[in-house]
């Protein structure tokens, strides 16, 4: 599944769909809850950008973690290959996540845009960021095949119901018409089983494998997935 962000540049959007087809992706998930960036105070405090901007603070961090510096300077220059031919901010210019969302993504995206993207893609199509019954019903109306009940990891607003809190109502309303995925807050095997017991067809998450990736690379991700699998199997037996 390819997580899709809807850009202002329609040519870029079309190109990304074409590349997904060439790469034989099974599905596209259109992200609908980040047409602008949330006020991510941690990023503001740390000065986080992608790629990293070298500052006195970051240089000190690199000095204290020499392997970071070795990896950064010994590998290919960071770039977002799908964006580099369209926008300079997509290549190697340091930009914050909030600035990227606000300046690059189409804040006027609506249901018609989502429906057109689904038609162009022509395959399994998910809307990521659905948190209400009314939006879930609309997703069914435009022909989506699945929805992710998600608040983007709680990173967009300072307060929100959790996806799990919304799950039962949404499943009751549309669960017989569309696949419902619980996204966010999934840390343990019991979390997966609780979501499935309410009616979710699947669960997804980010932090549980991204932290492992940052700490130990591919082997870390493999270990995190194995831990989750082991917990689910153990919890089902218990």
What are the roles of these predicted feature ranges?
Residues 1-141, 153-156:
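Active-site entrance/lid segments in N-terminal catalytic domains of soluble metabolic enzymes
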Residues 15-17, 43-46, 140-143, 162-164, ...:
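Short, glycine/charged-enriched secondary-structure capping and boundary segments
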Residues 26, 145, 201:
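Receiver (REC) domain switch/active-site residues of two-component response regulators
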Residues 30, 149, 205:
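Short beta-strand and adjacent tight-turn residues that come in two discontinuous sequence segments
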Residues 37, 151-161, 210-214:
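Glycine-rich, proline-tolerant flexible connector loops at the mouths of alpha/beta enzymes
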Residues 82, 165-182, 186-238:
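Alpha/beta catalytic cores of nucleotide-metabolism and tRNA/nucleoside-modifying enzymes
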Residues 108-115, 119, 161-175:
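Short loop-to-alpha-helix "cap/lid" segments that border enzyme active sites
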Residues 144-146, 151:
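Glycine- and Gly-Pro-enriched alpha-helical subdomains that act as flexible
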């Amino acid at each position: 599944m390819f997580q899709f962000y809807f850009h202002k540049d329609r040519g870029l959007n079309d190109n990304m769909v074409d590349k997904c087809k060439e790469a034989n992706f099974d599905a596209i998930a259109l992200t609908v809850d980040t047409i602008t960036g949330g006020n991510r105070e941690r990023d503001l405090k740390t000065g986080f950008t992608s790629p990293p901007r070298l500052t006195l603070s970051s240089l000190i961090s690199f000095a204290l973690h020499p392997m970071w510096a070795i990896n950064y300077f010994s590998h290919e220059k960071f770039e977002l290959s799908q964006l580099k031919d369209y926008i300079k901010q997509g290549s190697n210019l340091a930009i914050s996540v909030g600035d990227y969302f606000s300046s690059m993504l189409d804040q006027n995206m609506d249901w018609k845009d989502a429906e057109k993207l689904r038609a162009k893609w022509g395959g399994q199509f998910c809307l990521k960021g659905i948190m209400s019954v009314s939006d879930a019903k609309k997703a069914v109306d435009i022909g989506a095949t699945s929805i992710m009940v998600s608040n983007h990891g709680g990173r967009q607003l300072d307060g929100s119901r959790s996806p799990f809190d919304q799950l039962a109502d949404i499943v009751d309303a549309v669960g017989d018409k569309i696949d419902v995925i619980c996204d966010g807050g999934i840390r343990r095997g019991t979390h997966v089983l609780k979501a499935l017991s309410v009616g979710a067809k699947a669960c997804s998450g980010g932090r549980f494998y991204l932290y492992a990736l940052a700490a130990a690379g591919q082997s870390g991700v493999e270990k995190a997935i194995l831990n989750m699998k082991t917990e689910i199997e153990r919890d089902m037996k218990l």
